[in-house]
Amino acid sequence: MRPDMIVLHYTGMPDATGALDLLCTPGSEVSAHYLVFEDGYIVQMVEESRRAWHAGTSFWAGETDINSCSIGIEIANSGHGYGDPDFPKRQIAAVTALCRSILTRHTVPPERVLAHSDIAPARKQDPGEKFPWRTLSDSGVGHWVKPAPITEGGALLTFGHRGDTVAAMQGELSKYGYCIAVSGTYDSATQAVVTAFQRHFRPERIDGIGDESTRATLRELLAQSGRVRTIAARAHNLERLATS
């Protein structure tokens, strides 16, 4: 396996020890490469070269077998079902250091450091809106832009809306990598994807509504992603010229 994706999860269980037991029980049919405890202690359960069962039914940028191309990191946090606690700073420092270490061994583009909810928006919420994606990005892990400010007024795309503006947003979400049909109808699947996007990139308000803040943040992510790919391509071409 040559992973080109990192997927971050929360355990969603009352305590880390119980999560570790579950992840190490063959009959549970769930596993991950790493588990990061609240105090920053890291346990590796599966070698990075081997496939772990952490993604489930999922999709990103045309890929449906996420388990075969990703490294899964479980973060000990009881999640939405148990009070939605904050992530301790030392735990986030450990997650960041682990991801940076993985990036030295594998080529993982920033936009392929993802939440479980990004790749399975209809099923999953983790690691949730309290996960500090900006902190990771500031350390060179993942993709982040400053969210566009939330303002009252403007066009709001909500369940049942139809039209070109809906189709345009669906197309942009699909281009970024999400599993979404460009139908022009704001259906429940679109609502789930928008909610997942907000959890990751616009966590100030999670409502599944395609407001101007959400759409502007998405457009800036796409623009920045395009610039990063252009710079990477130029660097690759220069490297080829230098060695030819």
What role is predicted for each listed range?
Residues 78, 119-120:
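Short acidic/polar capping segments at secondary-structure boundaries
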Residues 4-111:
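Active-site-adjacent loop/helix surface patches within enzyme catalytic domains
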